[in-house]
Design a protein with these regions (language model features):
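Contiguous alpha-helical scaffold segments within structured protein domains
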Residues: 2-33, 37-40, 63, 114-216, ...
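Hydrophobic pocket-lining residues that define ligand/cofactor binding sites across diverse proteins
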Residues: 46
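A glycine-rich phosphate-binding loop feature that marks nucleotide/adenosyl-phosphate handling sites
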Residues: 59-60, 91-97, 148-149, 164-173, ...
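A short glycine-rich, hydrophobically flanked beta-strand micro-motif that places a catalytic Asp/Glu
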Residues: 54, 86-90, 223-230
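Short hydrophobic alpha-helical segments that form membrane-spanning helices or hydrophobic packing faces
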Residues: 55-59, 153
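Conserved hydrophobic core element of enzyme catalytic domains
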Residues: 180-288
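An anion-binding catalytic pocket shared by soluble metabolic enzymes
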Residues: 58-143, 159, 236-259
Length: 288
């Protein structure tokens, strides 16, 4: 099969036909120049060999024009994004984080440890083979996969199974997906959290330098965005997801945050449209 060079442009249309909300589209237009500057800074860091990967995010804030009907939103997410994990964290009636995460950080149940590498993105209407053959997306994906390998080795877990890479759809976007699993006697969930988070799926490579530049480029505190969210039981079983594709309802406002991974071969316009589609993917469930 002919491989797609990272220098070539994969024809991607990130336009969504499932939401037509003038106010939200106006917010996207207003934020486009700022987002473009962020993405271009990220691309320059890659091209200057300062970083190998960086995940740049964008946040939109708008007033909630009525009481948040969380049950209805979760019902729509369950129908429209069956492959995602729906999550809610309610600190109080005026601070609620919710969403539909495509990414499992890890789970441990009945001696089976499962990790997921989820990175590399395309609109769900794009031919899956194009995503599987895109060198840019494979590079982005492999940074996450290799980080998981390194983390397992640091945890002295050297025997594991790597499932075949595939494409999974999450609403209007699809991702490259690789499962890694290992049968082990026991593992401390807090140790897994320490080693696995933040992965290159939400941060970058090298991690320390990427964190510095993310804090420099993004003008907001990520807060709950991209944090681990999950549970641990008394037997040590656990399941943690990455709190992305989500929103935060706080003080009668809604914050929606989404990001995109920038690597060698990234094209600014594609990254901007990818971020906007991710924002739209959740906004349509809230605003419709």
């Amino acid at each position: 099969r002919k491989r797609i060079s990272s220098k070539k442009t994969v024809n991607r249309s990130y336009k969504s036909d499932k939401i037509n909300h003038d106010y939200f589209n106006h917010l996207l237009d207003q934020s486009r120049n700022i987002l473009s500057q962020k993405v271009l800074r990220g691309i320059k860091l890659i091209n200057d060999d300062i970083l190998q990967k960086i995940v740049i995010g964008s946040r939109l804030i708008f007033k909630a024009n009525k009481d948040l009907n969380l049950i209805n939103i979760l019902k729509k997410l369950r129908i429209n994004q069956p492959n995602s994990c729906k999550y809610v964290w309610k600190r109080n009636s005026q601070d609620i984080t919710f969403g539909a995460s495509p990414e499992k950080l890890f789970s441990f149940n009945k001696n089976l440890l499962i990790l997921e590498a989820v990175a590399g993105t395309a609109p769900s209407n794009l031919d899956k083979n194009l995503l599987l053959e895109s060198q840019k997306d494979l590079l982005e994906h492999n940074f996450v996969r290799d980080y998981l390998f390194e983390s397992l080795h640091h945890l002295n877990i050297n025997e594991y199974k790597i499932e075949k890479i595939k494409v999974i759809q999450f609403g209007d976007v699809s991702h490259l997906y690789t499962e890694i699993n290992s049968e082990i006697e026991s593992i401390c969930p807090f140790l897994l959290l320490e080693y696995l988070h933040p992965s290159p799926a939400v941060c970058g490579v090298p991690k320390k330098e990427a964190l510095f530049w993310i804090n420099n480029i993004e003008v907001y505190d990520r807060g709950n965005y991209a944090s681990p969210i999950g549970w641990i039981d008394s037997r040590g079983n656990s399941d943690f997801r990455v709190a992305i594709r989500g929103a935060r309802f706080i003080n009668n406002q809604i914050e929606i945050t989404a990001g995109s991974g920038i690597v060698k071969g990234s094209i600014a316009e594609n990254e901007i449209e990818e971020i906007n589609l991710k924002l739209l993917n959740l906004a349509k469930e809230i605003l419709s």
